[in-house]
Amino acid sequence: MLRETAVSKITLLLIFASVLVIPLFGFTQEPQKGQVTNLPIPRYVSLKVKEANARRGPSLSHKIDWIYKRQNMPLEIYAEYENWRRVRDFEGLGGWVHYTLLSGIRYVLIKNELLEMRLLPSIDAQVIAKVPQHNIATLDKCNKDWCRIIDDGYKGWVPKNGIWGVYENELKD
């Protein structure tokens, strides 16, 4: 009798464990898609206007937490609800912004003080400019470690880890 009880407990434990483990087989990490746009979540966008309110929730009746005042500022969308996008900036601050205030044109923010812009994507390449911290530059293209940006009439390559607004593994032609 004691042996049957132990066997039945082990059997139940195995069944329970298989219910938890079986769904994990064949699971592949696919990019999450926005419920409204079907575009990747998260993704980077930019501020289309000179001033935009970031609200606590996705409607005009929600309190304004932040006012963004830099046109072309890169923002990361990490949620969608109807005509609203939940965004965060390079400091991790944000809120809900109406989609009409955002653009798919990509910009990046310079993280490092006087980031060296180079002629080619190599640490040995000629420095053609030094871009000040917090400048906003147009994102042109990216390879594994470098991105080509356009800033103040200069077009050159900067290390990917010196900018905000592009993902570590992102490639852009």
Label each region the model flagged:
Residues 5, 25-26:
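Glycine-centered signal
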Residues 28-56, 67-71, 78-81, 85-93, ...:
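SH3-family beta-barrel domains
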Residues 1-14:
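Bacterial N-terminal signal peptides that target proteins for export
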Residues 63-64:
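Beta-strand-rich domains and repeat architectures in extracellular enzymes and scaffolds
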Residues 11-23:
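Bacterial N-terminal signal peptides
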